[in-house]
């Protein structure tokens, strides 16, 4: 026992252990007890705790943790993951802006609203205007945390500029010593300047790839320049304020500096603002109003010479960063204007402004607003331009004007002689293709979307007439054509048609039973595919005969209507599914679709051919519902596309900056679909293309934004009347031909309902928050009811109100809207 105590009682003892038995008897291990330190010494060993809580967390650097931080920043315990229904409810509430923890985003929405209102709807109130000119109060800035604001400095986010030489510029020529990283607040000083560390060696340069040098050489040869000048141009014209990552200097720092400037966490990166495009433009007059005594201040209190700062020079001696960016690039990078909520492009045109008295809560919401990138606007404009150019190059341009274009030509018709024929075509003042080509491309056209009663009656009458037709054979055996008896010359031709029991037929042989009518160049007795035999005997009704794909190999069958040379076949003419049996020349002159393999109009489906795109699942039932949204990407011509591009690059782009691409794209597409759906109901036989309903839906968004920012504007009634005057003017323009006012009206209604639900909203208190939730629910329910009623009217209860034509084409003169649509009244 004494030996055990001597060797240390704190050592583990295991009975029967071989290691313990082999221990030398004279070996003794003495472990001194831990010395108790004085409270003053213990506190002095800890790192000094900053009084400012902004130093507890750094965006750019990571501080070494002390004992005083371990208790405050403990790892959170495990929590149960939220259920799917809770996640859906939370995401939905955040989307509509009615969640309880959405205060931060609501402030962003409010700031965007003020920016937009100041541009679109006139002057703001004085308090709001002053608040917009002040910096953000919620986010700590460089001037507020490190030094008083000496001058107006551009903010440049440069997360890679975090070297030791910048943090400790006084130690450039002295031995390096370990320092804890000090990064003030949310944004470090290095984020506002572009200074690289490292003074020991030159920067590394990235080698030029072979492909890049090849492209440079090819471009030089095309321009007639020397290849050596093109390859050396890169080295001579490297003028940039920020070097690429491969050009960065290596920091001669120790392990601590390498650790604290390695990577950024997800939370830190999300908190860094994108201030590259939010700063004012850099110019020579930028520091003109700054006194000579005022200069930027570094983190250690060292004044930076203004000349060196404005010139883009490094802080330390011997450092070079290159030259400044070109003036155009700087203007593009630093002079991006924010979009004020309630003020935008239209408000800037109409000289709107905020009112003078606005609460501090609303001011904070307006202050934190930022602008989105208009990705949807750029994508939509690119698609519109490309599709319009392809359509023009493929289908050409129709006659330009507002009237009807008449073309007369001598064409070979059914009787075998040339006749003077007129082709009437509606002129297109948009400088684009004809209406027939637009329908074939996917324009809004009701007969291609659902079954139309008038067109069905037209097809039924044509088939009744075809049952009484026969084969008109020329007496000189020059040819034959399927026609009526009244159209067949009694002196120059023979009309071949058997009645019920007349004609050569064998009553005993049912397979050789003579049909009740005759079709030129088709007979069930000579057709081998499909053959008329057994259970597949062709009926007496010729309108139910199939297309014969294979005839019997015989030069002379003895049948007059088979041995003749056929001159006319079915041709689909017009946009209503009308069919005529005529010559190929006449069909091409009338811009129809000639069917070479068919002999009867009942064997072809003209409406399926006229509509184009994907074939109908059932040739008798149109089902191209996708025309409702496909027509949003088509235009009637070059001028139409230019008008859409101007509208999108002003109104749509401005609204997308405010609300983001996802919200604006939903409003744009749904309002356009609703407008086209209503136009298909009330104007079924008119081919319409273009985003007319979508554009008026965006105009409705301006009204909704005006209503939501009513308390912020100095003169809201003036802004309302100005917007109303613009919409009224556009509605009057819709009374002209080729402009769809029905799509405008319903697109405006649907856009207003969707804007109340999806656009950002500024809350003016708790009651206003609950009012917003009720407004979202009511708006979505009303829109769903409107859309469902339009679908029912289109498919189940079709309506035909001729008087509604005056809303989209008012007859200012007797011939202004006459025959605007060819064959509008079907006979």
From Swiss-Prot:
Residues 1-381, 649-663, 708-718, 766-773 are cytoplasmic. One of its GO terms (cellular component) is endoplasmic reticulum. Keywords: Endoplasmic reticulum, Membrane, Phosphoprotein, Protein transport, Transmembrane, Transmembrane helix, Transport. InterPro entries: Inactive_Rhomboid, iRhom1_2_N, Peptidase_S54_rhomboid_dom, Rhomboid-like_sf. It is found in: Endoplasmic reticulum membrane. The chain crosses the membrane at residues 382-402, 628-648, 664-684, 687-707, 719-739, 745-765, 774-794. Residues 1-86 are annotated as: Disordered. One of its GO terms (biological process) is protein transport. Residues 1-19 have a biased composition (Polar residues). The modification Phosphoserine is found at residues 60, 83, 87, 293, 295, 298. Residues 403-627, 685-686, 740-744, 795-827 are lumenal. Residues 64-76 have a biased composition (Basic and acidic residues). The keyword Protein transport applies. It is a multi-pass membrane protein. Its main location: endoplasmic reticulum. Belongs to the peptidase S54 family. PANTHER family: INACTIVE RHOMBOID PROTEIN (PTHR45965), INACTIVE RHOMBOID PROTEIN 2 (PTHR45965:SF2). Interacts with EGF. Interacts (via cytoplasmic N-terminus) with FRMD8/iTAP; this interaction leads to mutual protein stabilization. Interacts with ADAM17/TACE. Regulates ADAM17 protease, a sheddase of the epidermal growth factor (EGF) receptor ligands and TNF, thereby plays a role in sleep, cell survival, proliferation, migration and inflammation. Does not exhibit any protease activity on its own. This is Inactive rhomboid protein 2. It comes from Mus musculus (Mouse).
């Amino acid at each position: 026992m004494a030996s055990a105590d001597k060797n240390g009682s704190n050592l583990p003892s295991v009975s029967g252990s071989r290691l313990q038995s082999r221990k030398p008897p004279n070996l003794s291990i003495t472990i001194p007890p831990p010395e108790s330190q004085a409270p003053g010494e213990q506190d002095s060993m800890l790192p000094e705790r900053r009084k400012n809580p902004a130093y507890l967390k750094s965006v750019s650097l990571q501080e070494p943790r002390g004992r005083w931080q371990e208790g405050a920043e403990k790892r959170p315990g495990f929590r149960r993951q939220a259920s799917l229904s809770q996640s859906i409810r939370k995401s939905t509430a955040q989307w509509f802006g009615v969640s309880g923890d959405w205060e931060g985003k609501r402030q962003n929405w409010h700031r965007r609203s003020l920016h937009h209102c100041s541009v679109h709807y006139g002057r703001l109130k004085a308090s709001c205007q002053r608040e917009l000119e002040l910096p953000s109060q919620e986010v700590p800035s460089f001037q507020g945390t490190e030094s008083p604001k000496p001058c107006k400095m551009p903010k440049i986010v440069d997360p890679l500029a975090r070297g030791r030489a910048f943090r400790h510029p006084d130690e450039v020529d002295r031995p390096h010593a370990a320092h804890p990283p000090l990064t003030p607040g949310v944004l470090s000083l290095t984020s506002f300047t572009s200074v690289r560390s490292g003074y020991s060696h030159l920067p590394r340069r990235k080698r030029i790839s072979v492909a890049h040098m090849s492209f440079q050489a090819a471009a030089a040869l095309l321009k007639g320049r020397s290849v050596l000048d093109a390859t050396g141009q890169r080295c001579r014209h490297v003028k940039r304020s920020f070097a690429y990552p491969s050009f960065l200097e290596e920091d001669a720092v120790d392990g601590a500096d390498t650790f604290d400037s390695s990577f950024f966490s997800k939370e830190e990166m999300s908190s860094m603002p994108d201030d590259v495009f939010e700063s004012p433009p850099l110019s020579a007059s930028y520091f003109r109003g700054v006194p000579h005594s005022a200069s930027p201040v570094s983190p250690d209190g060292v004044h930076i010479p203004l000349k060196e700062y404005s010139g883009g020079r490094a802080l330390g001696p011997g450092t070079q960063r290159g030259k400044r960016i070109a003036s155009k690039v700087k203007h593009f990078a630093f002079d991006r204007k924010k979009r004020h909520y309630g003020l935008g492009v239209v408000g800037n045109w109409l000289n709107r402004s905020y009112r003078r008295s606005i609460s501090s809560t609303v001011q904070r919401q307006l202050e934190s607003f930022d602008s989105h990138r208009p990705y949807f606007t750029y994508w939509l404009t690119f698609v519109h331009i490309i599709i319009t150019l392809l359509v023009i190059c493929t289908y050409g341009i129709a006659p330009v004007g507002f009237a009807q274009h008449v073309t007369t030509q001598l064409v070979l018709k059914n009787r075998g002689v040339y006749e003077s024929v007129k082709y009437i075509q509606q002129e297109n003042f948009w400088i684009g293709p004809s209406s027939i080509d637009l329908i074939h491309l996917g324009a809004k056209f009701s007969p291609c979307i659902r079954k139309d009663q008038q067109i069905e009656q037209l097809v039924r009458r044509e088939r009744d007439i075809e049952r009484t037709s026969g084969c008109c054979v020329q007496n000189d055996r020059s040819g034959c054509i399927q026609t009526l008896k009244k159209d067949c010359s009694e002196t120059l031709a023979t009309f071949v048609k058997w009645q019920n029991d007349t004609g050569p037929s064998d009553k005993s042989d049912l397979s050789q039973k003579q049909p009740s009518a005759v079709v030129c160049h088709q007979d069930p007795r000579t057709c081998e595919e499909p053959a008329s035999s057994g259970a597949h005997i062709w009926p007496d009704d010729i309108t139910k005969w199939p297309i014969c794909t294979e005839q019997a190999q015989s030069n002379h069958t003895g049948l007059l209507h088979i041995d003749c040379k056929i001159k006319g076949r079915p041709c689909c003419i017009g946009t209503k599914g009308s069919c005529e049996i005529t010559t190929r020349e006449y069909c091409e002159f009338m811009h129809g679709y000639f069917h070479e393999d068919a002999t009867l109009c009942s064997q072809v489906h003209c409406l399926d051919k006229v509509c184009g795109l994907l074939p109908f699942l059932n040739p008798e039932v149109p089902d191209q519902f996708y025309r409702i949204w496909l027509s949003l990407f088509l235009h009637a011509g070059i001028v139409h596309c230019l008008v859409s591009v101007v509208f999108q690059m002003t109104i749509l782009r401005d609204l997308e900056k405010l609300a983001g691409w996802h919200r604006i794209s939903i409003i744009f597409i749904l309002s356009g679909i609703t407008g086209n759906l209503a136009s298909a109901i009330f104007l079924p036989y008119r081919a319409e293309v273009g985003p007319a309903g979508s554009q008026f839906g965006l105009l409705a968004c301006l009204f909704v934004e005006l209503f939501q920012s009513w308390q912020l504007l100095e003169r809201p009634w003036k802004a309302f009347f100005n917007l109303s005057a613009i919409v009224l003017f556009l509605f009057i323009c819709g009374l002209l031909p080729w402009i769809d006012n029905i799509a405008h009206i319903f697109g405006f209604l649907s856009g207003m309902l969707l804007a109340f639900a999806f656009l950002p909203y500024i809350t003016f208190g708790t009651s206003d928050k609950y009012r917003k939730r009720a407004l979202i629910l009511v708006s979505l329910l009303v829109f769903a009811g409107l859309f469902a009623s339009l679908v029912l009217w289109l498919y189940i209860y079709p309506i035909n109100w001729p008087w509604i034509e005056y809303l989209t084409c008012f007859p200012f003169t007797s011939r202004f809207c006459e025959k605007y649509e060819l064959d509008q009244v079907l006979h």
